[in-house]
Curated annotation (Swiss-Prot):
Protein name: Elongation factor Ts
InterPro entries found in the cross-reference section: EF-Ts_dimer_sf, Transl_elong_EFTs/EF1B, Transl_elong_EFTs/EF1B_dimer, Transl_elong_Ts_CS, UBA-like_sf
Organism: Prochlorococcus marinus (strain NATL2A)
GO molecular function terms listed in the Swiss-Prot or TrEMBL record: translation elongation factor activity
Cellular compartment(s): Cytoplasm
Length: 218
């Protein structure tokens, strides 16, 4: 197996315009074989999708999903380049799958890690730095542990980082790239909203003292 060097990854990226992580994964999967790695990226729809990623995706559709029991609902905006593609079965299927994904992932609040405000990342760091299991550890080791934990936590909040509910061997970002490759257009998840029945409503129950008094009176 050829060593997967940074130079090899860059060479594959230059040939396919795919992302660095996708290129590295392709080379690992194909034991460093360049031709097989290129074919692997094409089969995944990644290479062609990356080449189109600079084009503006201003069309698309807003999809909805209501979970069984009508207790959770999702609205999601998915963009593409043309109205023709937006009406197609592949795009509409992706829109529904993504809406279902949001409904199934209560921790997800943002489309990507890049969208998470710095204030939230700082708050997570503050929480992790204060954990008891880190006390007494050298600062350098503590910093690495905290960095890893924060990275994991932020990924849990991002839709594109989630394992796809219908195929956990890929994440949502890879799913979007695959469909974009098949369609031949850039696809972008712009935003979503999740509604949970009763969320934020404070249920008023009887005052405990009054309840006891009513039971003992008379």
């Amino acid at each position: 197996m050829a060593e997967i060097t940074a130079k090899l990854v860059k060479e594959l990226r230059d040939k396919t315009s795919a992302g660095m992580m996708d290129c590295k994964k392709a080379l690992i999967e194909n034991k460093g074989d360049m031709d097989k790695s290129i074919e692997w990226l094409r089969q995944k729809g990644i290479a062609s999708a990356e080449k189109k990623s600079g084009r503006v995706a201003a069309e698309g559709a807003v999809g909805s999903y209501i979970h069984t029991g009508s207790r959770v609902g999702v609205l999601l905006e998915l963009n593409c380049e043309t109205d023709f593609v937006a009406r197609g079965d592949l795009f509409q299927g992706l829109l529904r799958d993504l809406s279902m994904q949001v409904a199934a992932c209560p921790s997800v609040e943002y489309v990507s890690v890049d969208q998470i405000p710095e204030s939230i990342a700082n708050k997570e760091k503050e929480i992790e730095m204060g954990r008891d299991d880190l006390s007494g550890k050298p600062d350098q080791i503590k910093a690495k542990i905290v960095e890893g934990r924060i990275g994991k936590r932020l990924k849990e909040m991002a839709l594109l980082e989630q394992p796809f509910i219908k195929d956990s061997s890929i994440n949502v970002e890879e799913l979007v790239k695959q469909v974009a490759g098949k369609i031949g257009e850039n696809i972008r998840v712009r935003r979503f909203t999740r509604y949970i029945l009763g969320e934020g409503i404070e249920v008023q129950g009887p005052d405990f003292a009054e309840e006891v008094a009513s039971m003992t009176s008379g």
